[in-house]
From Swiss-Prot:
Annotated organism of origin: Arabidopsis thaliana (Mouse-ear cress)
Protein's name in the database: U-box domain-containing protein 35
Taxonomic classification: Eukaryota, Viridiplantae, Streptophyta, Embryophyta, Tracheophyta
Biased composition (Basic and acidic residues): 285-295, 410-455
One Pfam family here: PK_Tyr_Ser-Thr
Domain of life: Eukaryota
Listed GO MF terms: ATP binding; protein serine kinase activity; protein serine/threonine kinase activity; ubiquitin-protein transferase activity
UniProt keywords, alphabetically: ATP-binding, Coiled coil, Kinase, Nucleotide-binding, Serine/threonine-protein kinase, Transferase, Ubl conjugation pathway
GO biological process: protein ubiquitination
Comp. bias regions, Polar residues: 269-282
Catalyzed reaction equations: L-seryl-[protein] + ATP = O-phospho-L-seryl-[protein] + ADP + H(+); L-threonyl-[protein] + ATP = O-phospho-L-threonyl-[protein] + ADP + H(+); S-ubiquitinyl-[E2 ubiquitin-conjugating enzyme]-L-cysteine + [acceptor protein]-L-lysine = [E2 ubiquitin-conjugating enzyme]-L-cysteine + N(6)-ubiquitinyl-[acceptor protein]-L-lysine
Alphabetical list of Gene3D superfamilies matching this protein: HUPs, Phosphorylase Kinase, domain 1, Transferase(Phosphotransferase) domain 1, Zinc/RING finger domain, C3HC4 (zinc finger)
Length: 835
C-alpha cells in the first residue's frame, strides 16, 4: 500500500558553498574598480564561484594627535589603541563598500578581509597559502618602456605558491598571467589575441617529475610577455647519475610581470618587426626542437621508472632498454636545451637593442625640441630689439613733454604767488572768525560732555525704572476690580489706578506662558532705557508678577478716535497730519537708537495713544525687537528667522514671506496707519481701495473721511501717495523714514499748524509733556531725574537742596544726578519757533 506524498512544501535548501574561491587584492585607488569589474566578468560566469576582497593596510605603530603629531602605541592606553584600530578598520571597510556592491548587483557571494601588515606581498602570499587559493587577481601598475625596476605585481607573483594562478589587470584589461604549475596549458589573452604555452612534460604517470619541476620553477623567473616554456626533469638513465635540466627563461625577476597593455603591445610589435631577420634564422631550429620534444613527450608517457633506477620498461611491451639508448636520449635532450638556450639569449639581445634604439629616438626628439627653443629665443631677441627702439622714441617724446611741463609749472608758480597773497588776507579774516567761535566751542564742549554722560547712562545694562511692590499695585487697582479694567491687550488686561498720587495704567501679563515672560522682559528692557515725547512713558514695574505701570492717556487710542468709539468726536484733518508726523518721529528715534536699533513690529492705530491734548504716543512695545546692525549695509537690514508676529493687515508681506525683519517692516505698518488717518476705514483691502481712487479727484474726495473737515486737496493727495509708497510689497521699494518720509511730513505739519491756529483763533497751547511738574510752565532746560520724570533743571535742583524724595512719587531717590533730555529740548524749541 503506497502513501501519498506529503503536501507540505519543504523550505528551499540553502545555497551550496562556493566550490572555488577567487581572491581580488585591492589597494583602494581609483583603478581598483577596473580590477573588480574584470574579475566579475571573468569568473562570475563559471558557476558556483565565491570571491574574497583582500586589502592590506600598514601596521599601526603610532596614534595621531589633534596637533598633527604621532605618539607610539607603547605610550598610549590600550583602550585608545583599540579605538584607533577600530577606526582604521571601519575606514577600510567603508572604502571597500563600493566594490562589494558590484558583487551584490551580480548576485555573487563575496567576503571582505582586511589584514594589517607592512609587507603587502608577503601578507597576500600567506593568506593564499593558508586558504589554498588557486586563483588571485591583482592590479598592475603603469610602467614606462624604459622601466627596469620590479613593481609590486612582480613581487607578489614571485611570492605566490606554485598552485596559485596570478592574474594581473591593468586599465581594465588582462596585462599578464603567471600560471600555476598544475596547469597543463596557460593561455594569455592580450586585446583579443591568444598565446598558448604548453609544458614539455605530460600528465599521468609523470606526476613525480612534475613536482620536482615545480620546485625548480619556484626559483626561476617566468617572463609573461613572451611564451612560457617549461621543461620537466627526466630521471637518470645509468647508475646514480642524473641529467640536470634547467628551464630557460627570458629576462629576470624584475621583468617577470612585464605589462602588456595597449601601448607596450605596440612597442613589442615594433621590436618584432625590426628583428624579422634574426627570427628567421632560429625559427627552423625551434620547429625541429619542438618536433623532437613532442616525440620525447609521447614516448615518455609510456615509461615507468623508479626513484633512482637505472633502467625502465615500455608499458605493454616489457622490453628493457639498454644503457646506450638512455645515453643517446640524454645527449639529444642536451643538444635541444643548448639550442633553446642560444635562441632565447638571441631574443634577449635583440630586445635590448630595440630598447637602445628607442632611447636614441628619444634623444633625437629632445634635440629637435632644443632646436625649436633656440629658434624661439632668437625671434624673441629680435622683438626685444624692436621694442627697445620704440621705447627710445617714447623717451624722446617724454623729454619734450617734460620741457613743456616746466614752462607750465613756471606759469603756475606765478599764479601761486598771487593766490598766496590772497590767502594771507583770508587768513587774517579767519583769525577774527576764530576769536568769535572760541566761546561757541567752549559751550559745545560742555554740551558734548553732558551728552556723552547721558548716552553712557542710557546704554547701561541696568534697568532704570521705579520698582513697585505687588501689594501697592493690588491696593491701587482694588485687587484688579472689573470696574477699573479699561481694556484687554493681547497678553493681558489693562487697569486704571492711582499710584503715589499719580493716575497711571497697570498692565498685568499672563505669566503662565514662557512667551509672555519673554515679552515682558523685552518691554521692560526697552522702555526702561528710552525716553521720547512720543513714546508712552514707563513709570515703573513689578517684575516678580509681570506688571508694568504706564502713564495714563486720557483720550484713549487713535483707533477709538478714528472709528468714534463711545461717540467720541472725530479728529480734524490738521490733527491727523500732526499725529502722522509725531508717529514718524517716534519711529525714527527707535530705528536710530544706539547701540542697537529697535523694531516695533506691531505698529497699528490701537497702539497709538492720545493724551488730553491729543498728543500721540506710541505704546505696546511688547513685540519690539532690539537687533544688530548689518555692518555691510548703509541702511541696516536685520535678519531674524522667526514666525510672523504682529497684527493682520499691518504685517509686512515680505516679513510674512521670508521671516526677515527690518525697519522697512515698520514703514509698511506706518503706511497703513496713514491710509486710515485719511479714510477712517478698516485696513482690509484699503491699499487697493485708495489706489483705485487716486486717478480722479472726485473719487479721491469720496474716500476721505468727511467728518475731518475740508481736506486741502493738494497736501492730502501728497500724503496719500506717500502712504501708498510705504505699503509697497517689496521693502527696497519703500521710502526711507528719516530722509524721505519725515521731511515730507514736516512740511504737511506746518500746513496743519497754520490751519489749526486759524481754526481756533488763539495761540497754540503747549503740550502737557512740555510742562514742568514743579513750575507748571514750559521747561527751559528739561532734565531726567532718578525717578524717571522730566523736570526743569533749575526747579529740580532747588527741590533736591531740601528733599531726598521724588516730587512725583514721594519715594526716596537713589541718586541726585540729572540727565539732560535733548530730545524734549529740541521739541520745545521747535514748538516755540512756530508760535
Amino acid at each position: 500500500m503506497s502513501r501519498s506524498p506529503d503536501k507540505l512544501a519543504l523550505p528551499p535548501p540553502p545555497p551550496p558553498p562556493p566550490s572555488r574561491t577567487v581572491v581580488v587584492a585591492l589597494s583602494g585607488s581609483s583603478k581598483s574598480k577596473y580590477v573588480v569589474t574584470w574579475a566579475i566578468e571573468k569568473f562570475a560566469t563559471e558557476g558556483n564561484v565565491g570571491f574574497k576582497l583582500l586589502h592590506i593596510h600598514p601596521m599601526i605603530t603610532s596614534v595621531p594627535t589633534p596637533m598633527g603629531n604621532a605618539i607610539p602605541i607603547s605610550e598610549v592606553r590600550d583602550d585608545v589603541v583599540t579605538a584607533y584600530r577600530q577606526e582604521i578598520l571601519w575606514q577600510s571597510e567603508e572604502m571597500l563598500k563600493p566594490y562589494t556592491k558590484l558583487f551584490v548587483r551580480r548576485k555573487v557571494a563575496v567576503e571582505v578581509l582586511v589584514i594589517e601588515s607592512d609587507n603587502v606581498a608577503a601578507a597576500i602570499a600567506e593568506e593564499v597559502t593558508r586558504d589554498s587559493i588557486d586563483r588571485i587577481v591583482i592590479g598592475g601598475s603603469s610602467r614606462s618602456f624604459f622601466s627596469r625596476k620590479a613593481d609590486i605585481c612582480s613581487v607578489i607573483s614571485a611570492l605566490m605558491p606554485n598552485f596559485c594562478t596570478v592574474y594581473v589587470v591593468s586599465k581594465g584589461k588582462l596585462s599578464c598571467v603567471r600560471p600555476s604549475d598544475s596547469d597543463g596549458n596557460a593561455t594569455i589573452r592580450e586585446d583579443g589575441s591568444e598565446r598558448t604555452n604548453s609544458s614539455s612534460g605530460s600528465s599521468g604517470p609523470t606526476s613525480d617529475s612534475s613536482d620536482v619541476m615545480s620546485s625548480a620553477h619556484d626559483s626561476q623567473s617566468r617572463p609573461l610577455s613572451l611564451p612560457v616554456r617549461r621543461m620537466q626533469h627526466f630521471p637518470a638513465i645509468a647508475g646514480q647519475a642524473s641529467v640536470p635540466m634547467e628551464t630557460s627563461s627570458v629576462g629576470s625577476d624584475e621583468t617577470r610581470c612585464m605589462s602588456l597593455d595597449a601601448e607596450e603591445a605596440r612597442d613589442v610589435s615594433s621590436i618584432n618587426r625590426s628583428s624579422t631577420d634574426t627570427t628567421s634564422r632560429w625559427t627552423p631550429r625551434r620547429r625541429d626542437y619542438e618536433e623532437r620534444k613532442e616525440a620525447m613527450s609521447s614516448s615518455s608517457s609510456n615509461r615507468e621508472y623508479g626513484n633512482f633506477g637505472t633502467r625502465f620498461s615500455w608499458s605493454g611491451m616489457g622490453v628493457d632498454t639498454t644503457h646506450s639508448r638512455a645515453s643517446q636520449q640524454a645527449s639529444n635532450m642536451s643538444d635541444a636545451l643548448s639550442e633553446q638556450s642560444y635562441t632565447d639569449n638571441q631574443v634577449n639581445l635583440n630586445f635590448e637593442v630595440e630598447k637602445l634604439r628607442a632611447e636614441l629616438r628619444h634623444v633625437q626628439e629632445m634635440y629637435a625640441v632644443a632646436q625649436t627653443e633656440t629658434f624661439d629665443a632668437s625671434r624673441k631677441l629680435g622683438e626685444l630689439n624692436q621694442r627697445r627702439l620704440e621705447e627710445a622714441i617714447k623717451l624722446e617724446e617724454l623729454k619734450l613733454k617734460e620741457y613743456e611741463a616746466r614752462e607750465l609749472a613756471e606759469k603756475e608758480k606765478q599764479n601761486f604767488e598771487k593766490a598766496r597773497r590772497d590767502a594771507e588776507s583770508m587768513r587774517e579774516r579767519a583769525e577774527r572768525e576764530i576769536a568769535q567761535r572760541r566761546e561757541a566751542e567752549r559751550k559745545s564742549a560742555r554740551d558734548t560732555k553732558e551728552k556723552e554722560k547721558l548716552e553712557g547712562t542710557l546704554g547701561s545694562p541696568q534697568l532704570q525704572y521705579q520698582h513697585f511692590a505687588w501689594e501697592e499695585i493690588m491696593a491701587a487697582t482694588s485687587s484688579f476690580s472689573e470696574e477699573l479694567k479699561i481694556g484687554m491687550g493681547a497678553y493681558g488686561a489693562v487697569y486704571k489706578c492711582n499710584l503715589h498720587h499719580t493716575t497711571a495704567v497697570v498692565k498685568v501679563l499672563q505669566s503662565a506662558e514662557n512667551q509672555l515672560s519673554k515679552q515682558f522682559q523685552q518691554e521692560l528692557e526697552i522702555l526702561s532705557k528710552i525716553r521720547h515725547p512720543h513714546l508712552v512713558l514707563l513709570l515703573g514695574a513689578c517684575p516678580e508678577q509681570g506688571a508694568l505701570v504706564y502713564e495714563y492717556m486720557e483720550n484713549g487710542s487713535l483707533e477709538d478716535r478714528l472709528f468714534q468709539v463711545n461717540n467720541s468726536p472725530p479728529l480734524p484733518w490738521f490733527e491727523r497730519f500732526r499725529i502722522a508726523w509725531e508717529v514718524a518721529a517716534a519711529l525714527v528715534f527707535l530705528h536710530k537708537s544706539k547701540p542697537k536699533p529697535i523694531i516695533h513690529r506691531d505698529l497699528k492705530p490701537a497702539n497709538i495713544l492720545l493724551d488730553h491734548n491729543f498728543v500721540s504716543k506710541v505704546g505696546d512695545v511688547g513685540l519690539s525687537t532690539m537687533v544688530q546692525v548689518d555692518p555691510l549695509s548703509t541702511k541696516f537690514t536685520i535678519y531674524k528667522q522667526t514666525s510672523p508676529v504682529g497684527t493682520l493687515c499691518y504685517i509686512d508681506p515680505e516679513y510674512q514671506r521670508t521671516g526677515r525683519i527690518s525697519s522697512k517692516s515698520d514703514i509698511y505698518s506706518f503706511g497703513m496707519i496713514l491710509l486710515q488717518l485719511l479714510t477712517a476705514k478698516p485696513a482690509i483691502a484699503l491699499t487697493h481701495f485708495v489706489e483705485s481712487a487716486m486717478d480722479s479727484n472726485d473719487e479721491f474726495l469720496k474716500i476721505l473721511d468727511q467728518k475731518a473737515g475740508n481736506w486741502p486737496i493738494e497736501e492730502t493727495r501728497e500724503l496719500a501717495a506717500l502712504a501708498l509708497c510705504c505699503t509697497e510689497l517689496r521693502g527696497k521699494d519703500r521710502p526711507d523714514l528719516k530722509d524721505q518720509i519725515l521731511p515730507a511730513l514736516e512740511n504737511l505739519k506746518k500746513v496743519a499748524e497754520k490751519a489749526r491756529n486759524s481754526f481756533s483763533g488763539v495761540s497754540t497751547q503747549p503740550p502737557t509733556h512740555f510742562i514742568c511738574p514743579l513750575l507748571k510752565d514750559v521747561m527751559n532746560e528739561p532734565c531726567v531725574a532718578a525717578d524717571g520724570y522730566t523736570y526743569d533743571r533749575h526747579a529740580i535742583e532747588e527741590w533736591l537742596k531740601e528733599h531726598n524724595t521724588s516730587p512725583m512719587t514721594d519715594s526716596p531717590l537713589h541718586s541726585k544726578n540729572l540727565l539732560p533730555n535733548y530730545t524734549l529740548y529740541t521739541a520745545i524749541m521747535e514748538w516755540r519757533s512756530t508760535r
